UniProtKB/Swiss-Prot annotation:
Entry GO MF terms: mRNA binding; structural constituent of ribosome
Domain of life: Bacteria
Quaternary structure and interacting proteins, as annotated: Part of the 50S ribosomal subunit.
UniProt keywords, alphabetically: Ribonucleoprotein, Ribosomal protein
PROSITE patterns found in the cross-reference section: RIBOSOMAL_L13 (PS00783)
BP term (GO), one: translation
UniProt keyword annotation of Cytoplasm present: no
Function statement: This protein is one of the early assembly proteins of the 50S ribosomal subunit, although it is not seen to bind rRNA by itself. It is important during the early stages of 50S assembly.
Annotated family: Belongs to the universal ribosomal protein uL13 family.
Protein name stated in the entry: Large ribosomal subunit protein uL13
Species this protein is from: Rickettsia rickettsii (strain Sheila Smith)
Any Gene Ontology CC annotation: cytosolic large ribosomal subunit
Amino acid sequence: MKTYSAKPSEIEKKWWVIDAKNIVLGRLASRVANMLRGKHKPSFTPHLDCGDNIIIINAEHVNLTGKKANPKDGKIYYRYTGFPGGIKDTTAGKILSGKHPERVIKMAVKRMITRNALGAKQMSNLYVYANGDHPHMAQQPTVYDFASQNPKNKK
């Protein structure tokens, strides 16, 4: 029996919608990263974008375990401006309570995806919204009940 390798014309992408309300961030991000890569499908091919399109709603209500949500000494995200002494930091709690809470989920998933051109293409199939509304009803997304798969997924 030969090893199956999918062709780009054979790939079928589904649309999924996941409600992130009270879901643990790391567990959600790892599952979404696998779905974006297509590793949940038997037709997974490493060099092709065979993953699905994922819509995440209620990103502002995602949960962080332990002390990571603490605004003072929680999980710290660093960025560099490119100038000497230009390292900036912010915490996950500040981002979640700020203007763009969906960035916490996007950063968590992005850091679990391969860092190359294919990973960037797969990340373009992720749509994260802070509240419960999304403009993708025309694609008829299937609801993915992540919370009921494992009691540890919900906090």
